Structure formats: C-alpha cells, structure tokens
C-alpha cells in the first residue's frame, strides 16, 4: 500500500465528518506529479465503488477539491476522458435512491460529471479562469472570418456555462439535509462554483448582446434563446443563494444585466423575417440604402445594450460606494449640532458625568427654570415661585461615579450652585457635618436665584457665604463647631427633606464627598460615640446618633458633664463590683482642643481593685443610672 493510497483512505473514512486537512494537503500537492496523481486516482477508484454512503460522498468531495485547488486542469482533463468514474452503481444497488442522502449523492455526482464533460468540450474552466477570458475570446475579431469564429466560440461557451449552472442548482437541500456536516461542506463548494460560473455567464451574455445586430440571423436566434435561458437561470440562482444565506453562509450580492430585453429582441427578429435586410449581406445599391436605414435602427438598439453594459460595470465598481453616501450623510449630520455637547471638552469624563454637566452648564434657559438633574434616580424639587421654607427645594443626588479625573474639576450643578444661603461648610466635628449660615431665616421668602456655574472651586462657596453676611465675626462662627446660638430654632423649623442632609450616614453627592475628604481628618471620621457593651441589652436604646443634637447639648452641658463624670468616676472606683465594663474617657481641660478625648471610648475594660461590700450592691444601680443619665444626652433617642 503506497503512501498516497493511505492518504486517500484516511481522507475518505467512514466517519461522518469532512475530510481532514492533514490528508487533503498532500493529495492536492500530489496532483502536480503525474505518477503521484495516478496513485491518487487508483485510490479514489477503489473508494468510489464502496457501498457506504459516507465513503462515496467523501470521495466525490476529494475529486471536487482536486478540481478546484489542485494543479490547474489536471483532474478535469483526466476525468473528462474517464467519465465512467462517476457511475456509482454499487451504492445505488445496495441502498437504492429513495432516501434523501442518496438523492443528494446522485445530484452532486451528476454535477461533477457535467463539469468534467463540459470541460472536454470547451477546454476552459471558468471557475478558475474567470469571466475575463470569455470577453477576450470575442473582443479582438480581426477579419470577418475570425469575427464569426470568435462569436461561435462565445456562443458555445455561454451555452456550456448555462448547462453547468443548471446541473449545479439542482443540488437543493433542506434544513434537515444541512444538519449533516458532509453536505454542508459540499454545499459551500457548490456556492463558490456558482458565483464564478454565473459571473462568467453574465459577461458572456453582455458580449453577445453587444454584437447582436451584427450577427447572422441564425446566431441572433441562438443568442436570443441563450438570453431567455439566462433570464430564467437568474431567478433560480438568486433563490439558491438565498438558501445559502439561511444556512449561515456569507453570500455576496450579485450584479447582472437587465432581464427586460427579450421583447425588443424578439420584435427585431420578427421584423427581420419580414424585411430580410438586417442580417443579409448587401450587394446592390437598393439593398445598400435599405441597409443604411436598417443599420441605423440596429445601431440605436446596440447603443442601448452598450449603455446597459456601462451601467452594469459601474454598479460592479461602485458596489461599496452605494452604501457609503448614507454613512457620509449620517457623519455630516453629526458633525455640527448646535444643541449638542462638545466632545473635545469631555474626553476624559465618563458619559453620565459629561451629560449631566453639559446639560446644565450650556443651557441658556437654566437661569429661568428650576434646575434638574437628569441622571439622578431621586430628585425632590419645589416650584421656585411658591412661598415655601428656604430648605424645601433640596435636591438629593446620588453620584454613581466616585472616581473622577484629576485634571477636571467638579462643577456645582445641584442645589448649592443656586442657593447662596445654604452652604456646605465643614464644622470640624467627628461626624462630617456641615453648618448652616445664620442668614437663612432672613432669606426665607426669597425666590431661587440664578444658577452659578462660573466657578468650579468648592472652596469658593465658603468665601461667598462669608462675604454675603458682611460680618467679620461670621467666619469665626462658621469655623467654630461649638458656636451654635440659633441652632435649636433652626432645627425645629427645619423640614424633613433638609434633615436628611444632617444624617451623617446619608449618601452625599460627589462634590460634598470631595470637599469632606480634603478637610476632614481621619481621626475625626472614626470617632463615634458608643454605649457600654454591658448596658446595651438593658437600656434598649438604638445606636443611632444625630450630630446636630450632640453638638447642641455638648455646648450647653459640657462643663456640667465634666464635673459629674469626675465625681462618678471616684464613686465607681469605690463602689464598682468586679464585673468589667467600658468607662467613657475623661474629657480634657480644654473642650475645644481636646475633642477626641470626650468622643472616643476606652478600648479596654476597667476592673476596680477593691472588693465591694455586700450591703453596697443595692445602692449601685442608682449610681449607674446617675452615671449614664447625663450621657444619654449624647445619644439620639
């Protein structure tokens, strides 16, 4: 057993899968050598006579690939002289021809047989040579004798192309047939052959129609018959290619000459049957005059056909240009938009932030209407022309993009950009709170002022609030977290929407978070008041704190609490039992400079050394109650 016979056997295994490339490549290379080619042919002869459907079908696939990709015209020349290779009688006798697989095998075998037979007639493979060879055969006529010979060759080649296409389009498959991998592999090869053959046929028809009025009457009738067949084949080819698209194959759009010349050509032939002036050689003067008239009419029709050819060639060259104007129009429409945004200014900003900033900053009507945040999930607004409290128009925005480029500053587009009387001033407290200007009560009946979008500096808001008050001491009041003269009044008249901002655990906008991160120390963020762990179960007090109540009571009762805590700690050291609990830290001498000493709890339990007396355990509970009675002021009930 030779090497090529083994390769053929491996390429035509009974397995229902396309031939592997490791077998096909050596076989295709072997077609360039005559001895190797004959060994391949012997191996295929033994496999084509097998009774297994997969082996026979894969043998035909190998022959098809040798015709398409092997040495040029080697396989076609051999099988055109040995058409008996395609007589697959053994498998027909064993399996019959009723099944769908057998019908597909017969149609595929017949197409390859027709392909080889037509090559024996015209000695031309238009799948590999292309349609340009057909154009050259009829282009340069030379003498009239050569002209007629070239036209006859063109007629023969066009007729052969139509026969091959008719045999090819008979290989129709259903969706069930295309589920077979072998049939899909062969179907792809058929589609590629059909595109090449149809392009060659289209060029041949154009060549014949250009010379239609210069042909003999017999050749003109033959050309008309070929043109009618071409019109019918065009419809079938289009349907066949559509079936390839449904199978998931990439099918290009085919271009062909018009199919509406049948009637005009028939009328011309009928007229010539009556006059006998169009295709008859002219010898007399009378005939010459009649020929001039007839020639002028024929020339007009010839020019029409040539115009059809020029249109077709323009369509083939400008196939992609037909799609590009739509894209150019869309690009031109998008190049200038007076109401759009400038993309060059926001190349490094995320889409949501850029849209939100540009819709407010570039809108000329934003100063006349209530500002709205387009991309925020929740927004609570009030009309600007109503007499409502100054905090009723608070917008709560949630920014889902906490990361922003360092080179782009954040612009105030929320409520603080249009309300000067409510400024997010940092208080310095451990809860990240913000103070409220004292001039808010005086501006309660004022409407919302124009939006301020000129400044991107978050510190400019603090300066604007300081200048607006006109009081030099007001800046100190804002910077002092313990100076709250009118806090209780403002807190009682404050609506629920504004109190949401006072919640230290409430989500803040990105501008407030950026301002807080620049000025708030890390130690003050982590300082949170907690109750002793031993008292949480009995007191049933929720662990929620309000920074405003803490600051108000702290400024009023701080000194009293300091004295009481010192006395209570002395009593605790004498009367406290062995049970350990956390003791709040003693406040420093200066309540302003030593804030963290009164806010942070001790991190270790306290165990007194003295043993308590049995009779003193009954008096311990009121002492503990007095001890934490004052500390309850620090907890939001």
From Swiss-Prot:
The protein's matches in Pfam families, at most eight in alphabetical order, are given as: ANTH (PF07651)
Where in the numbering of this chain does the ENTH domain appear? 1-126
CDD domains, alphabetized:
ANTH_N_YAP180
GO cellular component labels: cellular bud neck; clathrin-coated pit; clathrin-coated vesicle; plasma membrane; prospore membrane
Q: Which UniProt keywords apply?
A: Cell membrane, Cytoplasm, Endocytosis, Membrane
> Which InterPro entries does UniProt cross-reference here?
ANTH_dom, ANTH_dom_sf, AP180-like, ENTH, ENTH_VHS
Q: Which GO terms describe its biological process?
A: clathrin coat assembly; clathrin-dependent endocytosis; endocytosis; vesicle budding from membrane
The Polar residues compositionally biased stretches are 623-637
Primary site of residence: other
Q: Which PANTHER family does this UniProt record tie to the protein?
A: CLATHRIN ASSEMBLY PROTEIN (PTHR22951), PHOSPHATIDYLINOSITOL-BINDING CLATHRIN ASSEMBLY PROTEIN LAP (PTHR22951:SF5)
What protein family does this chain belong to?
Answer: Belongs to the AP180 family.
Q: How does it assemble?
A: Interacts with PAN1 and the clathrin heavy and light chains CHC1 and CLC1.
> What functional role does this protein have?
Involved in endocytosis and clathrin cage assembly.
Spell out the protein name for this chain: Clathrin coat assembly protein AP180A
């Amino acid at each position: 057993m030779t090497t090529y016979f083994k390769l053929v056997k491996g390429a035509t295994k009974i397995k229902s899968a396309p031939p592997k490339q490791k077998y096909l490549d050596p076989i295709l290379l072997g077609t360039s050598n005559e001895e190797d080619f004959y060994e391949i042919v012997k191996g295929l002869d033994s496999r084509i006579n097998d009774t297994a459907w997969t082996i026979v079908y894969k043998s035909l696939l190998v022959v098809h690939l040798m015709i398409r990709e092997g040495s040029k015209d080697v396989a076609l020349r051999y099988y055109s002289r040995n058409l008996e290779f395609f007589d697959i009688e053994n498998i027909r006798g064993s399996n019959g021809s009723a099944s769908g697989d057998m019908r597909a095998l017969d149609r595929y075998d017949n197409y390859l047989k027709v392909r080889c037979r037509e090559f024996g007639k015209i000695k031309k493979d238009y799948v590999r040579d292309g349609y340009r060879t057909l154009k050259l055969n009829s282009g340069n006529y030379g003498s009239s004798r050569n002209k007629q010979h070239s036209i006859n060759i063109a007629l023969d080649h066009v007729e052969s192309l139509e026969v091959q296409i008719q045999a090819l389009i008979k290989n129709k498959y259903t969706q069930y047939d295309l589920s077979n991998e072998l049939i899909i592999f062969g179907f792809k090869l058929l589609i590629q052959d059909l595109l090449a053959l149809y392009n060659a046929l289209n060029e041949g028809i154009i060549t014949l129609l250009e010379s239609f009025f210069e042909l003999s009457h017999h050749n003109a009738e033959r050309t008309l018959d070929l043109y009618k067949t071409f019109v019918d084949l065009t419809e079938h080819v289009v349907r066949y290619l559509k079936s390839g698209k449904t199978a998931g194959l990439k099918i290009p759009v085919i271009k062909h000459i018009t199919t509406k010349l049948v009637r005009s050509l028939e009328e011309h032939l009928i007229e010539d049957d009556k006059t006998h002036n169009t295709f008859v050689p002219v010898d007399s003067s009378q005939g010459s005059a009649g020929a001039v008239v007839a020639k002028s009419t024929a020339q007009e029709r010839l020019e029409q056909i040539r115009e059809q050819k020029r249109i077709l060639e323009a369509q083939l060259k400008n196939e992609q240009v037909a799609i590009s104007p739509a894209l150019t129009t869309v690009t031109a429409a998008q190049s200038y938009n007076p109401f759009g945004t400038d993309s060059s200014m926001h190349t490094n900003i995320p889409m949501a932030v850029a849209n939100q900033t540009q819709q407010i900053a570039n809108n000329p009507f934003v100063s006349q209407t209530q500002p709205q945040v387009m991309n925020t999930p929740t927004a609570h607004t009030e009309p600007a022309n109503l007499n409502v409290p100054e905090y009723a128009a608070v917008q709560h925005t949630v920014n889902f993009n906490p990361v922003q480029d360092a080179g782009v500053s954040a612009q105030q587009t929320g409520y603080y950009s249009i309300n000067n009387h409510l400024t997010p001033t940092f208080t310095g407290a451990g809860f990240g709170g913000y103070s409220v200007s004292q001039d808010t009560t005086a501006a309660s009946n004022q409407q919302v002022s124009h939006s301020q979008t000129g400044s991107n500096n978050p510190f400019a808001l603090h300066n604007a609030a300081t200048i607006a008050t006109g009081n030099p001491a007001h800046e100190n009041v804002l910077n002092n977290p313990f100076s709250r003269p009118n806090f209780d009044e403002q807190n009682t008249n404050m609506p629920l929407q504004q109190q949401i901002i006072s919640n230290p655990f409430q989500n803040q906008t990105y501008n407030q978070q950026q301002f807080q991160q620049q000025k708030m120390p890390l130690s003050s963020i982590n300082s949170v008041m907690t109750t002793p762990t031993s008292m949480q179960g009995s007191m049933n007090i929720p662990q929620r704190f309000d920074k405003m109540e803490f600051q108000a009571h702290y400024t009023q009762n701080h000194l009293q609490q300091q004295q009481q805590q010192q006395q209570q700690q002395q009593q605790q050291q004498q009367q406290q039992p062995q049970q350990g609990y956390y003791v709040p830290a003693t406040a420093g001498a200066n309540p302003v400079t030593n804030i963290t000493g009164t806010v942070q709890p001790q991190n270790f339990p306290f165990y007194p050394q003295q043993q308590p007396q049995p009779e003193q355990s009954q008096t311990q509970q009121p002492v503990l109650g007095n001890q934490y009675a004052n500390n309850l002021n620090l907890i939001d009930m």
